[in-house]
Amino acid sequence: MKAIILAAGRGSRLLSLTEDRPKCLVEAGGKPLLAWQIEALRGAGIQDILVVGGYLGHMLHGPFVRRHNPDWDKTNMLASLLVARDWLQAAPCVISYADIVYPARAVARLLDAPGEIALLYDVNWRKLWTKRFDNPASDAESFTLDAGGNVTGIGQKGVPLESIQGQYMGLLKITPAGLEWIEALLARQPELRARLDMTALLARKKYGLKIDLFQEMYGFGLNINLQRLLV
């Protein structure tokens, strides 16, 4: 198992904190976010880590492979992810946003999740959003499951709070078969490569999943049918 940290974007929501550093080097609890992420990944047994940089990417140094998205200011997360296409082809990879913190046990749970693509979401998201925003609905995105455990909505703004069953937290796993689905989608619609973020990518399919309770977080494996592209 390998890991890819997507750290190309400016992190504009962090405002002045990223004026002189990439968002993954902003400090929390006495050390950079990137250090927390590497610690969690290593704690879950992942030794091979790749960081895709962009904005101030020359500042990224550490016990990892560094790649650069030269179009970081014109593209979104999918383009940064595909900078590490060879890693995705070679083995299942944990994909991490660069502006989040998580424990090793969350990564470990994700490693065990079934499916070609798997991700974690937070069922207790509302407590955190209430602390961050006067109006949690202004930032929250849709995340709904049907009675059979299938994702029916993800990543849409402006939905009623009572309909949201969790929030995707920026940590997922993609297998080589999951990459095949992504590439099949892009073969049909190559213009999506530059503009899709991760939730928009996932929202372009309907898929089955299995739910795995993990304290505040749930892990679920996405059983993607590569023959059925719903766009």
Predicted regions span which residues?
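Short alpha-helical oligomerization interface
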Residues: 19-24
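A short acidic, often aromatic-flanked loop/helix-cap motif at beta-alpha or helix-coil junctions
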Residues: 72-76, 126-128, 218-221
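Short, well-ordered alpha-helical microsegments
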Residues: 57, 103-104, 226
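Conserved alpha/beta core of the MobA/IspD/sugar-nucleotide pyrophosphorylase nucleotidyltransferase superfamily
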Residues: 1-3, 154-155, 160-231
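Conserved N-terminal catalytic core of the sugar/cofactor nucleotidyltransferase
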Residues: 2-5, 13, 26-27, 31-95
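Conserved core of the sugar-phosphate nucleotidyltransferase
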Residues: 62, 104-185
